[in-house]
Amino acid sequence: MRRVHVSVTGTVQGVGYRYTLQHVAQRAGVTGWVRNLRDGSVDAEVEGEDAAVDAVLAWMRQGPPGGHVTGTHVVELAPAPASAGTSFEVRRDG
């Protein structure tokens, strides 16, 4: 299992980034969350099997049509407790 925190910059708000990421994450079978930040970036946490996390990260670096990712910052985290969640959710803006 692998868990990462990701900050994404660029044109990533108002282009469907969070909801498309939720769909991509659910199809990959990972858990976590995504939210918009006030500075115009997107913040996310992704956890799952290594290959699934890598696939989601690859999508996050590209983003949806209409978006333009200029940077991603990935920080490796310790695995979450088993009770941390079983889905990938879109959170309220932070």
Model-derived segments and spans:
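Intrinsically disordered, low-complexity, mixed-charge
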Residues: M1-G94
